[in-house]
Amino acid sequence: MPFMTKKLQEILVSRALQKHWLFTILLLLPILSLVSFHIGLLTAIIFTLIVPGLIFHRFFSLKLHEILVFVPVISVLVSTQLIYYLSLILGYSREIIFAAFLVLVVIYGLVKSKKDSTYSFKGILKIAQLNKVSLLIFLLIFLISAVILCRSVWFENDLGIVITGSNWQDTPLHYEIIESINNGNFPPEMPNYAGNSMSYHYFVDFHTAIVEKTYGFLPKLLPFLNSVFIVIFALSVYSLARPNGKRAAIFTTVIATFGWGLSYISLFSAVTSGQFNIATNYMYQYNGFFGLPPIFDNLLQQRPLLIGLPVFAFNLALMRNMENKNKTILAGVVTGLLFPFHAVSFLCCYAAYFVSLLLNSNHFRKHQLYFLVSAIIALPFLVSSSASVSITFTPLWALSFLKDPILFYIANLGIPFLLSFIFIKRIKGTFLKIVFVILFLAPNLISITPNPWDMY
């Protein structure tokens, strides 16, 4: 009889582990992280890029391609803000980070017991196997980004440490923010102006600081995470274009990620003339004709864009159907969480919302106002940053230093810009078209950034 009881207990434990294996692993990871820095790093990556998304996607009816964007986007937004507020109360430390992860484990267990996921892991893997071309594209985007960044951002050689790019001066600032936070600068002040409150949308750097804090000084983490964020951007573009078909979505993803202006002509010219030199050739001309950095270069260097653009693209996908109450709420929540990461994308989300509201005015529903919950979520940061935000009118700013603005836009915005006009009739609905026109014209009317081209 004791043998039977023991056998029954083993069977019950085995079944419980099979049913709750993910919960068990997630519970063990933060605990084991206290004794292993390598496990701590892995845990931070999982909990800040995956776990919150696994929790909250159950509350929204999303398609698989939308979930693949939702999971990393909401994970970064939620985990970073959770740790921020906990750190304000209890202090910023490695232990508080793991305590926040344990809070997420508890929430995951409670939610999982009440709401089933639409997709199982096996189901996702099965569908993923059918989309090998898409997977290959995303893998190539990650590898290309990682190779470029690992050889250009914090690349050590005999002469010192290499940091390059069209906006190379900003990269040290990102490192200063990350390392100063992890060395006691919390709540953070400007690392290069001690005593001045942080006036920069720094939360993407705070996310990197959180991940690094679990391991220790790790400057190569920035190229890795940037590569991951570029893939998230690619996923967001794919999700936005997916209603137009799989082939169109893949094509759009490649063009949006790697498409740039026509400044690469100078690269071909330098190569064919034998004048190419990696140390001196430069695609960007500050306040000159090629004055807008290519989007891929922006994604490599402008870190706030790494989360701002994916959230904006994801919101565009959500706002196409304002009849769906849950998606309207989700768009508002994501927008509200976005503000400390990237203020310009926050404003772009509001511009898209008002366009969608206008287009749906004949079928107005009260739930369409739920998007405004974003203002409540972002309120603490809106109040604290209001003094540092300045809006200036810059009517037709390109005319102030260019003879031919039309040629300037074609040359700098390049292939994606031209294709947008050529195929604008094929885009379903008017929502994306109007948003495109408004956001294209906006930098010619107002500027809220130090440089006008930053508005692009």
Language-model features, listed with the residues they occupy:
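Membrane-embedded, hydrophobic transmembrane alpha-helices
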Residues: 2-128
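Membrane-interfacial loop-to-transmembrane alpha-helix junctions, especially the N-terminal start
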Residues: 16-23, 60-75, 131-135, 247-249, ...
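Transmembrane catalytic cores of multi-pass membrane glycosyltransferases
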Residues: 29-37, 170, 271-272, 343-348, ...
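Structural signal for the C-terminal ends of transmembrane alpha-helices
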Residues: 35, 56-62, 107-119, 150, ...
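Active-site lumenal/periplasmic loops and adjacent helix-entry segments of GT-C-fold
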Residues: 44, 141-311, 343-347
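Transmembrane alpha-helical segments of multipass membrane enzymes and assembly factors
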Residues: 51-67, 88, 236-251, 321-324
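Membrane-interface alpha helices of multi-pass inner-membrane proteins
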Residues: 297, 327-343
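Membrane-interface transmembrane helices that cradle and orient dolichyl/undecaprenyl
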Residues: 307-308, 312-327
